[in-house]
Regions:
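NAD(P)H dinucleotide-binding glycine-rich loop of Rossmann-like/cofactor-binding domains
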Residues: 74, 87-149
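Conserved beta-strand positions in the Rossmann-like core of class I SAM-dependent methyltransferases
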Residues: 73, 170-172, 236
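Glycine-rich phosphate-binding loop and adjacent beta-alpha segment
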Residues: 182, 215-274, 278-281, 304
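Short amphipathic alpha-helix with an adjacent loop that forms part of the alpha/beta core around
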Residues: 194-207
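A glycine-/small-residue-rich N-terminal strand-loop-strand element
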Residues: 27, 69-93
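C-terminal capping/lid region of NAD(P)-dependent oxidoreductase domains
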Residues: 272-274, 288-304
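N-terminal glycine-rich beta->alpha transition that marks the start or flank
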Residues: 11-15, 20-69
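Mid-domain Rossmann-like dinucleotide-binding core that forms the NAD(H)/NADP(H) cofactor-binding site
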Residues: 123-192
Length: 304
């Protein structure tokens, strides 16, 4: 029997329930995976709250969770892609808050050598989104990039990946996370009035930022981006909407192969994900409460 965390109606995280289910043997093209680590993302609590129902219509009961890492326990008939005992990363649309799941094989990526399950479970969403965004920005050696929300899961991954690309990073975060950004190698700037001027003050002699990744989508971040770029730079956002589009920010487009690419960076030691909380899977509701508060560092991990 597999344990799952699910919800039967939209609401706050406390609508989540814990139950068990019997999994069928995997059919053609399917693989059963025992999850060892499940990563929490802001999209999880937004899914439960109903904020995403326009884009992700659900049939209840529904199970949140889009990234995890674990071990293959069974494969479908005549399947040659993975074998029992293989360590893998899973990335799907939903269904990850489980101890074990039957998933399409094309949602799996081999676990890179030397990368543990918790680190691997952070790769698809935080790492993959950051990687896709920076590639979309065509970021390269010598560029200066501004990352809004640089202490969060996607932001902190982007700080490290940008440096692996040879770029210089200016990152916005709360006062409490300024030293953390320095430890990651970014030049930190606090939120609040005068943000664009503070960024100019640390960017370079000319005060030039030509690329922006916005992971927060606040009025302050959008205004600062518009003031800094003045229509001449490149900007992408992980929180697209009318306001960000009006400010000239494009939505991040996820790249094929991003999980494997970030996995390679992790195996090389060029990116390490900060785990802010480790909690049992059955405490997923509390984990989502923490996640939706924001201003955290890194990732929340559920341990099945």
């Amino acid at each position: 029997m597999s344990t799952r965390v699910y919800f039967e109606e939209y609401g706050d995280p406390q609508v989540l329930k814990v139950g068990t289910e019997k999994l069928a043997e995997p059919g053609d093209g399917l693989v059963r995976v025992e999850f060892r680590a499940v990563s929490v993302n802001p999209a999880d609590w937004k899914l439960v709250a109903g904020h995403l129902k326009k884009w992700v219509p659900l049939d209840f009961p529904a199970v949140p969770g889009s990234e995890a890492a674990g071990v293959v326990t069974a494969v479908g008939p005549a399947f040659e892609g993975f074998a029992v005992g293989d360590e893998v990363i899973w990335n799907g649309l939903l269904g990850g808050y489980r101890t074990e799941a039957v998933v399409p094989a094309d949602q799996l990526t081999p676990l890179p050598a030397g990368v543990d399950f918790e680190q691997a479970a952070c790769i698809p969403v935080a790492g993959g989104t950051a990687y896709s965004a920076l590639k979309q920005l065509n970021l390269g050696a010598g560029d200066t990039v501004l990352i809004h929300g640089a202490a969060g899961g996607v932001g902190s991954a982007a700080v490290q990946i940008a440096q692996a690309f040879g770029a210089r990073v200016v990152g916005t975060a709360s006062q409490a996370n300024q030293e953390y950004l320095r430890e990651l190698g970014a030049e930190p700037v606090t939120y609040g009035p005068g943000l664009a001027d503070r960024v100019r003050g640390v960017a370079d002699e000319a005060g030039t930022v030509m690329a922006v990744l916005d992971t927060v989508g606040t009025e302050d971040s959008l205004a600062a981006t518009a003031e800094l770029l003045q229509g001449n730079g490149r900007a992408v956002t992980t929180v697209p909407g009318e306001q960000s589009a009006a400010a000239g920010l494009a939505a991040v487009q996820q790249l094929e192969g991003r999980v494997a690419e970030v996995g390679t960076l992790a195996a090389e030691g060029q990116i390490t994900f900060t785990i802010s909380h480790r909690m049992p899977l059955i405490e997923a509701a509390d984990a989502l409460d923490i996640c939706r508060m924001g201003h955290g560092r890194g990732k929340i991990m559920l341990l099945p």
